[in-house]
UniProtKB/Swiss-Prot annotation:
Keywords: Cytoplasm, Nucleus. The keyword Hydrolase does not apply. This is Cilia- and flagella-associated protein 299. The keyword Nucleotide-binding does not apply. Transmembrane segments: none annotated. One of its GO terms (cellular component) is nucleus. It is found in: Cytoplasm; Nucleus. Pfam families: DUF4464. May be involved in spermatogenesis.
Length: 239
């Protein structure tokens, strides 16, 4: 039976699904011939590893670290939709600057767009950028093949010609319509309110950025940064 130390020098952790699989790899055919019991052979191998660097607990730790490294590597290899694109408009550059943060959950941006649809009707919407990134392919937008336009499924949609309006909650925001000064959006991640009234401050952890664009009549981006909760002990607030 081997002592198991060679697993770090040459063998890879992902070759073994469980610690028992690793123990089995240390058992030679001759061992099973004499012992005639695989479980006993495993116990003897495990006892022989007590003084080595690969006891069960260490194996599980290394296995978890290897899996975390694999997932992180896969995440890094996934390109952003804006990567490698020639961004000719301020609006596209602004979206590209915010893409990674909105994909990772560090930021939830709301995009206000006012423009015309294919019928020449003026339409506008408040768009949950993070939500759209997850549900749509943004490469055609960044490459200039398509324009990002308001949809009736966005947080808030309005057709100025027909006066048709629609409000929808998203995975990130709850729409609050019963407010005298206009629409409010409640972030589901931290429960903070984002105010899109241009005469008011946007709110805690939020900023308002008008964007001059040749592609649209009017564009404003509201960025809401998601603050991680502190580890400080405190009394929970009642709902």
């Amino acid at each position: 039976m081997d002592n198991g130390k060679g697993v770090f020098s040459g063998e890879k952790m992902d070759e073994f699904r469980t610690y028992e699989d690793f123990l089995d790899s240390q058992i030679k055919p001759v061992d099973l011939f004499y012992l005639e019991d695989q479980e006993l052979a495993r116990q003897l191998v495990e006892l022989g590893l007590k003084d080595s660097s690969l006891e069960r607990e260490e194996f599980e730790t290394r296995k978890a670290a290897a899996e975390a490294s694999r997932l992180a590597s896969g995440s890094q290899q996934k390109k952003l939709a804006s990567t490698g694109k020639e961004l000719k408009d301020n609006f596209l550059r602004a979206l590209a600057e915010r893409e990674e943060a909105n994909r990772s959950g560090e930021m939830n941006s709301i995009i206000f767009i006012r423009d015309q649809n294919a019928r020449g009707q003026e339409i506008s919407a408040y768009i949950d950028y993070s939500h759209r990134l997850k549900s749509e392919d943004f490469e055609p937008y960044f490459s200039g093949k398509k324009r990002l336009l308001p949809k009736t499924s966005d947080l808030s949609f309005y057709n100025w010609r027909t006066q048709k309006s629609k409000h929808n909650n998203s995975s990130n925001y709850e729409v609050i319509t019963e407010n005298p000064s206009g629409l409010l959006f409640k972030c589901k991640n931290d429960r903070k309110i984002l105010n899109v009234d241009p005469e008011k401050l946007p709110g805690d952890s939020s900023t308002r950025t008008p964007v001059q664009s040749d592609l649209y009549v009017h564009v404003v981006i509201y960025d809401h940064v998601i603050r991680k909760p502190t580890t400080r002990s405190c009394t929970p607030l009642s709902n």
